[in-house]
């Protein structure tokens, strides 16, 4: 029998816009955990570091719930990046005008699964 158990982790209100995180999330979707971490560590972006923390948290959750699980058995199943809260502020401009400054954040959802063969 083929056993697939799934484990999740979420990062909420992370200080980076979803537009910047989504291309990085596309690079690791469907990959083994060790390969995904290697890809994220080699990227110089701040977003890669944030995404790496959530991926490591999901893998840690998987290894906590199943002590016999090794890193080689963990695969990335789902990576979703959604809009988080927006912090709006005012940016003073010339001649008494003002522009609106919007600082975006994102929610990252990572789901990993274990690939292993088990008995009944």
From Swiss-Prot:
GO terms for molecular function: rRNA binding; structural constituent of ribosome. Keywords: Ribonucleoprotein, Ribosomal protein, RNA-binding, rRNA-binding. Residues 1-20 are annotated as: Disordered. Gene3D superfamilies: Ribosomal protein L22/L17. The keyword RNA-binding applies. Coiled coil: none annotated. GO terms for cellular component: cytosolic large ribosomal subunit. The keyword Iron-sulfur does not apply. It comes from the Bacteria. One of its GO terms (biological process) is translation. Part of the 50S ribosomal subunit. This protein binds specifically to 23S rRNA; its binding is stimulated by other ribosomal proteins, e.g. L4, L17, and L20. It is important during the early stages of 50S assembly. It makes multiple contacts with different domains of the 23S rRNA in the assembled 50S subunit and ribosome. This is Large ribosomal subunit protein uL22.
């Amino acid at each position: 029998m083929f056993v697939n158990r799934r484990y999740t982790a979420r990062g909420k209100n992370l200080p980076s816009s979803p537009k910047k995180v989504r291309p990085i999330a596309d690079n690791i979707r469907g990959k083994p955990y060790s390969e995904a971490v290697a890809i994220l560590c080699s990227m110089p972006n701040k977003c890669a570091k944030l995404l790496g923390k959530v991926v490591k948290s999901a893998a840690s959750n998987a290894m906590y719930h199943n002590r016999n699980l090794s890193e080689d058995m963990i695969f990335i199943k789902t990576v979703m990046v959604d809009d988080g809260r927006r912090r709006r502020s005012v940016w003073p401009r010339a001649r008494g005008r003002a522009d609106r400054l919007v600082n975006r954040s994102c929610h990252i959802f990572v789901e990993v699964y274990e690939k292993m063969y088990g008995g009944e």
